[in-house]
Regions:
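Glycine-rich phosphate-binding loops that contact phosphosugars or nucleotide phosphates
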Residues: 40, 45-127
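An N-terminal, well-structured beta->alpha segment
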Residues: 2-45
Length: 127
């Protein structure tokens, strides 16, 4: 591949990313602010992030980023959650569930479990 073609493709990819970032502006609204405040105010708990499949990969990255920036956090494997791992979810935690469809049974199980405690905050992110 020639240098000119490589530069063209690189610029094209960057433009796609720029356009995608610009389109996110519309999502900075009241719901976004509420979500951010819930996360910021998680003082006596931890941030637990979960997802299934590709969403699980994203969830794992989010948990790692929260942890590396000083926010107590971990990734909860949704497929193992129903087999004893949900016990890691405790009062004052924030549970963030990432899903493409919002229909994953594994995540529904986490929602059902977490809903039993009013001090656990649930955040759902779907496409």
């Amino acid at each position: 591949m020639k240098n000119k073609k490589i530069k063209f493709i690189a610029k094209e990819v960057l433009q796609i990313e720029i356009n995608a970032l610009k389109s996110l502006k519309k999502f900075i609204n009241q719901s976004f602010l509420k979500l951010i405040k819930i996360i910021i105010n998680c003082k006596n708990g931890k941030i637990i992030v979960s997802g299934v499949g590709k969403s699980g990969i994203i969830a794992r990255k989010w948990a790692a980023t929260f942890s590396s920036t000083g926010t107590p956090s971990f990734y909860l494997d949704a497929s193992n959650a129903s087999h004893g791992d949900m016990g890691q979810i405790t009062s004052n935690d924030v549970v963030i569930l990432i899903s493409n469809s919002g229909e994953s049974q594994e995540l529904k199980n986490i929602i059902q479990y977490s809903s039993r405690n009013k001090n656990i905050k649930l955040i759902g992110i779907t496409s």
